[in-house]
């Protein structure tokens, strides 16, 4: 049979399938005429055209809805018959809910007569149009207020940019933070970002560790010296204390614990002498933080002062002096006669940090203090207020009020003392700033100026925070703060310019990493354990490559300003040798010097895809295919649901209770194909309505196994049939034709992605009143060639993003 190529065209938002010979021959005149007639017929019958309510819509409602939602019976207090004006505001909620119920096949009930595909489409088109027309007569709605706590991911990135402290596997104070919840697919949703007592405890501990790591708290006024007399030392082994004297009668240690605020070089000194006039020779060591600096004591009853330079870390360390057993015997062998008497220790001193200057301060310290220190012209209290005002404005992402500066300066004053360094005295105030609700939450307090919907337009600082956490998952930078302070950021032109600048910044990788992984639902791959017997070992290197691929695709589309349709299908992907083997792809060769290095071979790189690769876009990446599979086998339902939810924005309702899952065919021993099993499952009327939407999509992806490899036979060794018929009668065969169908529905995909990004950026579940904004965003994106950067920019410029509703009084943070 001659192979055909399949193309999809869209007429009035409805896909139409055209098939052409694989050799690309043009259609005959007769075939072209037939298609032209079909296209004109489609236009004439009005695919997507708005039907007349009284003549076309009301009869459908009467036939399918009035029995349960009419004058005689009004279940749920829904009565379609009593509507006198279908385009009046009171009907808006009813039509919006009806649209959702019909779109998700929840209404009419499965045991009632069902509309045909054409009737359902006609109803949905009218309902959507009715909601839009009603919305056009009402003021815009910014949506319910959301008080959003920083997620763990945002907290780490904010601390990095605020404090200049890098987080890695060796230093991550957020490790024990409670896991963030998720709602509407994203952990940025304010509904799940509460604070528990465990959060408070962890925030305090994390802030203290970060501040200690970031700032130099001692040494800027000169090295500090600690001195401990003999009686203040702890003894161990042959070390003794008697009448205020410390001495060794045998090998042992004399130590003192000290808290080092600043890592660096220190000088450790000890005053040591023999206790009598006998000649002696003994091996000792100055000890600090498990390090030993050895020295030999050879004197005749005289006091010896010895010192060594030693590097110490920040934190609690043990310093002191040790009399070493092993060296004692060897040293005595060379002495004149056996060792007699005692070794006496008068005192120990520690001085440091040494050689510390303002020029040598770490970047993290400069970010916190901005070069501000007390001087002859600036008192310590004045310097503290300057630091608090400057650092606090960055921490709170807005200027502090005079009362706030006074409050935190009071915390400094309570700690301040002549013997305490300025930086050390500032620590409690810095900690208080970092555990304030105004740092941990993105607070948008009420103001006097109201917008059209009774809410408020965001000021420059609030808008800057929304923008930076949307694109960077972190705080605004200096340029964005400056735009906010000048008032320019609320202008369309400046807001657009800043958005483009920030998308070009490396920090925008957070959007790909944080948004894309949640939108695609691939975080579960981190813990996905496919059955080894069937799929082999999913090693760490391969798993990392699998997780990186869709993120890099999303990032590349942003970086190159490509069409968002490349998320559906593209002629490139990202892979390394590990992923190339999984996909059976031949990667372009690396230069000889790179080929020899394993690290280079494992780097992900952009590669072109051959026409028969069956890859391209994110749907056919191993990450998505694993996330929508079971550990032992594929799942038509999960894959179909994934496409409906994440590409088309039409998720099915939750499954009916007590409906059994499909068994594992390889284990059950049945010879039924997947298609035969699904047909049996769909015989249950509780399952049929949803499965008729999900299963065809899953069938089209059946050539991919549970870890994303291409195959021709399924787990039970049955030949795979990847043909599928959708509810509207459209037929597709395999993933390539499915992608073409999805491309024909590019406006649905654009609208779905717009809704997902808006949900992520606003931190709340989408509401019916968001439909108007989503429609405007997706329409503007389509006009500009479906560019992903345009979609993001239009979201930033949208009414919901730039405005908010009133915050209920019980949500206002009162703590400073």
Residue ranges and their predicted role:
Residues 15-26:
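Short, low-complexity, charge-dense intrinsically disordered segments
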Residues 30-43:
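Bacterial N-terminal signal peptides
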Residues 46-226, 322-328, 335-374, 385, ...:
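Aromatic- and Gly/Pro-enriched helix-to-coil junctions and flexible linker segments
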Residues 48-97, 104, 111-117, 312-313, ...:
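Sequence context surrounding c-type heme c attachment/ligation sites in exported
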Residues 126, 146, 154, 158, ...:
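Extended surface/linker regions that mediate inter-domain or inter-protein docking
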Residues 273, 279-340:
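Beta-strand-rich ligand-recognition modules
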Residues 422, 440-465, 476-558, 728, ...:
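Long, ordered, helix-rich scaffold segments
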């Amino acid at each position: 049979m001659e192979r055909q190529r399949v193309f999809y065209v869209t007429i009035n938002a409805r896909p139409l399938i055209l098939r052409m010979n694989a050799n690309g021959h043009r259609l005959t005149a007769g075939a072209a005429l037939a298609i032209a007639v079909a296209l004109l017929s489609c236009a004439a019958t009005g695919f997507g055209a708005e039907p007349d309510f009284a003549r076309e819509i009301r009869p459908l409602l009467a036939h399918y809805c009035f029995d349960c939602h009419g004058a005689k019976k009004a279940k749920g207090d829904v009565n379609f018959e009593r509507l006198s004006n279908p385009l009046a505001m009171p009907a808006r909620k009813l039509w919006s809910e009806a649209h959702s119920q019909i779109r998700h096949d929840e209404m009419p009930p499965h045991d009632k007569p069902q509309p045909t595909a054409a009737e359902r489409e006609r109803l949905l088109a009218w309902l959507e149009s009715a909601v839009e027309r009603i919305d056009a007569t009402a003021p815009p709605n910014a949506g319910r207020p959301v008080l959003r706590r920083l997620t763990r991911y945002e907290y780490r990135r904010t601390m990095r940019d605020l404090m200049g402290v890098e987080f890695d596997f060796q230093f991550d104070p957020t490790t024990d933070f409670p896991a963030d919840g998720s709602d509407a697919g994203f952990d940025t949703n304010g509904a799940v970002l509460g604070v528990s007592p465990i959060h408070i405890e962890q925030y305090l501990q994390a802030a203290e560790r970060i501040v200690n790591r970031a700032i130099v708290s001692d040494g800027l006024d000169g090295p500090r010296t600690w001195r401990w007399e003999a009686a203040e030392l702890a003894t161990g082994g042959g070390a003794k204390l008697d009448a205020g004297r410390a001495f060794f009668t045998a090998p042992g240690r004399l130590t003192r614990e000290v808290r080092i605020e600043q890592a660096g070089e220190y000088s450790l000194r000890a005053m040591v002498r023999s206790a009598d006039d006998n000649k002696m020779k003994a091996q000792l060591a100055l000890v600090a933080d498990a390090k030993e600096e050895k020295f030999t004591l050879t004197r005749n009853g005289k006091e010896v002062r010895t010192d060594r330079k030693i590097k110490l870390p920040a934190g609690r360390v043990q310093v002191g002096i040790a009399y070493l057993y092993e060296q004692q015997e060897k040293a005595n062998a060379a002495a004149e006669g056996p060792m007699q008497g005692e070794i006496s220790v008068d005192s120990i001193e520690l001085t440091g940090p040494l050689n510390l200057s303002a020029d040598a301060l770490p970047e993290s310290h400069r970010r916190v203090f901005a070069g501000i220190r007390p001087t002859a012209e600036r008192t310590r209290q004045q310097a503290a207020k300057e630091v608090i005002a400057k650092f606090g404005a960055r921490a709170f992402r807005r200027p502090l009020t005079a009362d706030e500066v006074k409050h935190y300066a009071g915390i400094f004053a309570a700690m301040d003392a002549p013997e305490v360094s300025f930086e050390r005295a500032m620590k409690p105030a810095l900690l208080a700033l970092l555990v304030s609700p105004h740092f941990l939450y993105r607070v948008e307090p009420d103001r006097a100026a109201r917008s059209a919907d009774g809410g408020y337009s965001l000021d420059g600082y609030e808008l800057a925070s929304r923008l930076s956490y949307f694109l960077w998952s972190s705080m605004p930078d200096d340029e964005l703060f400056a735009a906010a302070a000048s008032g320019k950021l609320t202008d369309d032109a400046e807001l657009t310019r800043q958005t483009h600048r920030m998308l070009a910044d490396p920090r925008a990788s957070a959007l790909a990493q944080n948004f894309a992984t949640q939108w695609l639902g691939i975080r579960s791959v981190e813990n996905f354990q496919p059955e080894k017997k069937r799929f082999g070992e999913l090693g760490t290197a391969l798993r990392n490559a699998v997780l990186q691929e869709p993120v890099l695709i999303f990032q590349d589309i942003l970086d190159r300003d490509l069409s968002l349709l490349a998320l559906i299908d593209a002629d490139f992907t990202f892979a390394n040798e590990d992923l190339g083997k999984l996909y059976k792809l031949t990667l372009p060769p690396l230069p000889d010097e790179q080929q020899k290095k394993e690290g280079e071979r494992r780097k992900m790189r952009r590669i072109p895809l051959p026409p028969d690769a069956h890859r391209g876009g994110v749907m056919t990446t191993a990450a998505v295919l694993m996330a929508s599979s079971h550990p032992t086998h594929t799942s038509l339902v999960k894959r179909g649901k994934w496409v409906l939810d994440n590409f088309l924005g039409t998720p099915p309702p939750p499954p009916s209770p007590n409906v059994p899952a499909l068994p594992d065919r390889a284990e059950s021993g049945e010879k039924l194909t997947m298609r035969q099993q699904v047909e049996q499952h769909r015989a249950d009327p509780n399952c049929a309505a949803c499965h008729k939407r999900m299963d065809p999509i899953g069938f089209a992806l059946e050539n991919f196994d549970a870890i994303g490899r291409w195959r021709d036979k399924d787990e039970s060794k049955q030949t795979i049939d990847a043909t599928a018929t959708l509810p509207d009668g459209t037929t597709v065969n395999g993933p390539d034709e499915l992608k073409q169908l999805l491309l024909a529905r590019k406006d649905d995909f654009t609208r779905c992605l717009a809704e997902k990004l808006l949900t992520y950026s606003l931190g709340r579940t989408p509401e019916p009143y968001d439909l108007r904004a989503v429609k405007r965003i997706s329409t503007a994106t389509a006009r500009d060639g479906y560019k992903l950067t345009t979609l993001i920019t239009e979201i930033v410029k949208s009414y919901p993003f730039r405005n908010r509703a009133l915050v209920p009084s019980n949500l206002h943070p009162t703590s400073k």
